[in-house]
Amino acid sequence: MKLSKYAKLVKQSGSLYLCHVEDSGVWLGTRWGFYKANGLPETVDSDTIMTILDFDSKAAEKIVVQERDFETVHDMFGMDLSDDPAPDIEAKKIEVAAVYKGTFATALLCNDGELVFYDEAQLSPLADVFKESDYVQTVVRVDPAGRRYVVIRNGFDTEAGIMPVKIVSKEFLGDLSDFQARCTEQYFREESRAAALAAVQAAEAETGEQATMEGMDE
């Protein structure tokens, strides 16, 4: 886990969660995600973590710090962030992302057909994991209330849990439909232009070829 990347997310969200989990050690979080803090001692407290993250007193004033204790990693704010793969729902990243009214959302298509959107920037603390491992997997889990969230696994280990982003709405679908219609119109415009240009180039090539042959006859 890159603590410098995590610190940037903390500044952006204005929140820092320091979680002591009895069966899993220390986890760090923001409003949008929680990360396994491998290497941090279980005795770390809120003052120490602010020092480790290099937050001065001015920066600290803008950050709400919450230190929480959990009995099990199976229930952290309703999320199961255990290494147990049983709750995993397979999902694959869709190549088309959604950027809407300032929100950038990556979409995952679950194997049951449901879409889950999340902010991929929340994965920045795991940059070293993605770079160094060939076994990173993005899956989806469901909390007791039926809400889905994203889990990042590295082999047999769970590295993070990311909260979903709410982006699909009636207004979004209306704007998306209009955008799709305009893209379709633009596609046919460009196809028509390309066909017209190809016809002109073919005619010019034929004319040039005829002129060359006439010159040879003379």
Language model: regions and residue ranges:
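Intrinsically disordered, low-complexity linker/loop segments enriched in Gly/Pro
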Residues: 1-37
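Short, structured "edge-of-domain" segments at secondary-structure transitions
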Residues: 2-11, 41-55
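C-terminal functional regions that serve as terminal interaction/effector modules
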Residues: 30-33, 39, 50-218
